[in-house]
Structure formats: C-alpha cells, structure tokens
C-alpha cells in the first residue's frame, strides 16, 4: 500500500461539518448492508468530488474505516484539489491488470481514511468500470472497510456513473442549487433507474443561505416527514442542520434537508 499526504483539507465551519454528520447519519438509516455508495451529479462543477471527500472525512472521524475510490477516470480532479503528493499507481493501473489492488490503495495522513486515485486516463474507461475487475474490487473492499465511497463522473456527460451505480449498494445524486433544472435531474434519475440502481437520495449543494432563508431558519430544528415508497418503514425525526447539502434516504428514514455553505466545484 502506498502512503500519501493530503495537504489541502478544507477547514469547515460548524454548520458545514454538522451537515456532513447529518448526511452520514442518513446513510446509516439506509440499512446496515449499504456500504458501497457511489456519488454522481448532472454536470461538472456541482461539488460532487468535494461532497465525496468531505463525507469520507466525516465517516473516518466517526471511527469508520473508509476508502474513497476515484472512479472519474476521464477527468479526475481529486489529487490536484487536495494537493496530495503523486501516487505511483491508481485505479486505471489496477483495472488494466498492471498492478495488484493493494498496490493501487493509498494510506493517507488521516486516520481511517484511504484513497484509490484514478490514475492515468485509459482509452476505455466505460469498459474498465463495467468489467469483472472493478466489480470484484468493490467486493474485496466491502470486506475490508466499513464504507466504500465511489466518486463517479457526472451522469449528464457520460454513462460511467450508471455503470458503477448498478453494482453499488446505492447512489447519491449531488445537485447544485439554482443551477440544474428539475427536468435534468429527472433525466439523470431515469438513467439510474433503468440500470436498476438504488437511489439513496439527493444532496442539494451550494445553497445560498441569504437567498434561501428556509435552510437557515430551521437550523437545529427536529422534524420528521415519512415519505414511503412502497417499503416498510418508520417515521424518524432528523435534524435540519445547515444550508448547502440536502439528503434523504430511500424510504427508510425521514426526509431531511441540510446545507453546507461554500462547497467547491468538482
């Protein structure tokens, strides 16, 4: 296993950190067998990679052994954004049979947090992500880690996210507030449904709390609103904490709206 140092970890304010704790809690309500989770978005620059990274940090801080798999093989921004020193091998090296899985894994300077970086851009990203090697890799990581978070490309651009989502336990869609139309989000949702992907919920990102006072007004307020989808479930009260990441689980917990001001692009 390689060792890498992440030099640019964002300092989050209280509300932002609490929002990720809420997202972390909501995912736990999705079920104990939901361990391999992919994140996608409609378009680039909605904050998908930032949400993936900060979710992993939150999980790691809670004591969960967590690994972030950078499956954006076409245009990864992870290593550059967080100023990690260059890894020797990445996901594309492993999927193309050049190295063993352990060689592609990186132990970071954050306790409980490992990363598999994307590696060099391959000529056939979709084929690699849809192959047996990627599926088998996720099963191996499932046995080793409490959570496997997979950062995938925007689904509005390429089909890779649907390919990955179909073999994960569930998918979270990151949507930039005020930038993406309802119809566009529904189109992405339809693509995921077609491949049998379980959609765990949606993170509403980059919410302007001044223009959207709703998210700030109910900060710290507990509420529950069960929205069953044909599955058995009980109403749970979740905490409405912040104004930039909204999340809700797949019919197993209450609808929750949270927010985290100032998320980066990616």
Segments (PLM) and residue ranges:
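P-loop NTP-binding module
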Residues: 1-266
């Amino acid at each position: 296993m390689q060792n890498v140092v992440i030099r640019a970890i964002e300092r989050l304010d209280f509300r932002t950190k609490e929002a990720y704790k809420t997202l972390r809690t909501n995912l736990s309500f999705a079920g104990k067998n939901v361990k391999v989770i992919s994140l996608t978005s409609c378009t680039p620059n909605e904050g998908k990679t930032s949400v993936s990274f900060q979710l992993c940090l939150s999980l790691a801080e809670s004591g969960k052994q967590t690994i972030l798999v950078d499956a954006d093989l076409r245009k990864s921004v992870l290593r550059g954004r967080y100023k990690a020193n260059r890894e020797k091998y990445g996901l594309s090296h492993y999927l193309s049979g050049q190295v063993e899985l352990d060689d592609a894994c990186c132990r970071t300077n954050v306790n409980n947090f490992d990363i598999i970086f994307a590696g060099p851009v391959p000529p056939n990203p979709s084929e690699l992500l849809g192959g047996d090697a990627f599926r088998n890799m996720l099963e191996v990581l499932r046995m080793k880690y409490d959570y496997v978070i997979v950062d995938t490309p925007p689904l509005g651009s390429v089909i890779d996210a649907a390919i990955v989502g179909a073999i994960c336990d569930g998918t979270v869609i990151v949507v930039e507030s005020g930038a993406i139309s309802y119809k566009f989000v529904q189109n992405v949702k339809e693509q995921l449904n077609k491949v049998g992907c379980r959609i765990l919920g949606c993170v509403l990102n980059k919410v302007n709390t001044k223009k959207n006072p709703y998210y700030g007004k109910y900060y710290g307020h507990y509420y529950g609103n069960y929205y069953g989808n044909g599955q058995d479930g009980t109403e749970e009260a979740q905490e409405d904490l912040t104004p930039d990441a909204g999340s809700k689980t797949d019919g197993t917990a209450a609808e929750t709206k949270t927010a985290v001001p100032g998320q980066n692009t990616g």
